[in-house]
Amino acid sequence: MANAAKTITVEQTASAIRRHHSQRATLIGLKLNKIGRTAELQDTPEVRGMISKVQHLVRIVDEK
């Protein structure tokens, strides 16, 4: 059986209003656009970097 890819669930906790356009674009890249929305993403270094860029706007809900 192939190794299952690890996933990470993130939730948007703050608004993107009055944020830099690059932070808004990062949220869109994380499949988030409204407060309270969650997205399940693959746990890769790229995704971790995106999360760290907007860590004041999101929280990690679950890591599998």
Swiss-Prot record:
BP GO annotations: translation
Pfam family name, one: Ribosomal_L30
Keyword Ribosomal protein attributed: yes
GO cellular component, one term: cytosolic large ribosomal subunit
InterPro entries: Ribo_uL30_ferredoxin-like_sf, Ribosomal_uL30_bac-type, Ribosomal_uL30_ferredoxin-like
Protein family according to the UniProt entry: Belongs to the universal ribosomal protein uL30 family.
Subunit-structure text: Part of the 50S ribosomal subunit.
Protein name: Large ribosomal subunit protein uL30
Organism: Rhodopseudomonas palustris (strain BisA53)
Encoding gene (name): rpmD
